[in-house]
Amino acid sequence: MSKEKFERSKPHVNVGTIGHVDHGKTTLTAAITTVLAKTYGGSARAFDQIDNAPEEKARGITINTSHVEYDTPSRHYAHVDCPGHADYVKNMITGAAQMDGAILVVAATDGPMPQTREHILLGRQVGVPFIIVFMNKCDMVDDEELLELVEMEVRELLSAYDFPGDDLPVVRGSALKALEGEAEWEAKIIELAGYLDSYIPEPERAIDKPFLLPIEDVFSISGRGTVVTGRVERGIVKVGEEVEIVGIKDTVKSTCTGVEMFRKLLDEGRAGENVGVLLRGIKREDIERGQVLAKPGSIKPHTKFDSEVYILSKEEGGRHTPFFKGYRPQFYFRTTDVTGTIELPEGVEMVMPGDNVNMVVTLIHPIAMDDGLRFAIREGGRTVGAGVVAKVIA
């Protein structure tokens, strides 16, 4: 088949497989691409092509991730699969592969296992909004009651972590049999794809969200005022609109009196563009890198939050020694470092390089943040960890 041109017309949705080791995540990924290619067109990806995942760097952390793409009649999917448990943890915490929804793979022969639980918890903490369950290896279980029992266990586990366990879709299938072309099991893959289409809503595009620009630099231009530069993270800013400067200091209002890109004047700056924004009545010394420019009322500054963190191993260039509760590193948000203190969970005395841990962080300056914001943990400019804001506290 010749390479089709990339269809921008279909909504684009990011998904991924999560679940315990050897429950069949990669086999399912291969089965989805194969069955959907056969049914709706597109190209299949073999198991071994998916399993030897290339390394990527996200926030200075090496992660092995496989990306595959597939289509249903109504959508285009980008799907991420990781070979190892540690890769999942890193992937979910760094947000290297943001997921609009996840397929939780549980082997019917085993039921939920420790990593099943851990991936569900991580999904909750990092804000994976929707989970669909694929009960795999159902061809190996003859007892209908056993299947009922496993499904019930999985639903209860999801409910325990605040997912709608009673209502979310559960598909009973066999990835291997589907991959081998057995029609009754291929039908289960089509059923799963149907749930991807119907259960995961179309994600809101960055351009439709409220305006936010992390400030990278500040200049004053004589006779014109103060210009801040940076890449618009989301939304649109139009000339004449009110904006807020949020973080580090008290929040200040201003008006955008001009937008420039490559020395040209524009009417607006949009998500993804590197722009300069001219601000009315603001002095150069009133603004600094690390603040954000945002739609008024859309984001607030905070100093205290609950987070999920991955600490780099020595081999990844991280610390060589554990840290304890008095640890005071820098937390790097968007464009700047802010010092913070940490509280570890009860019973956790120290954190080893290579661990992932839940911690409450208190920053010495407020930073504009929402749940789901990613950050790096640094010591003297060197990245030693990555984290995500699970919940803002104050």
UniProtKB/Swiss-Prot annotation:
Q: Which reaction does it catalyse?
A: GTP + H2O = GDP + phosphate + H(+)
From the UniProt entry, list the residue stretches annotated as the region G3: 81-84
Record carries keyword Cell wall biogenesis/degradation: no
An example of a Gene Ontology cellular component annotation for this protein is: cytosol
Enzyme Commission code: 3.6.5.3
Q: Where is this region: G2?
A: 60-64
Tell me, what is one Gene Ontology molecular-function annotation carried by this entry? translation elongation factor activity
Q: Which UniProt keywords apply?
A: Cytoplasm, Elongation factor, GTP-binding, Hydrolase, Magnesium, Metal-binding, Nucleotide-binding, Protein biosynthesis
**Class of the enzyme per the UniProt entry, highest EC level:** hydrolase
Q: Where in the cell is it found?
A: Cytoplasm
* Positions that bind GTP: 19-26, 81-85, 136-139
Give the start-end ranges of region G4. 136-139
Per UniProt, Mg(2+) binds at: T26
Task: Tell me the domain of life.
Answer: Bacteria
Give the record's subunit note: Monomer.
Q: What is this protein called?
A: Elongation factor Tu 2
Give the species this sequence originates from.
Answer: Serratia proteamaculans (strain 568)
Q: What is the lineage of its organism?
A: Bacteria, Pseudomonadati, Pseudomonadota, Gammaproteobacteria, Enterobacterales
What gene is this protein translated from? Answer: tuf2
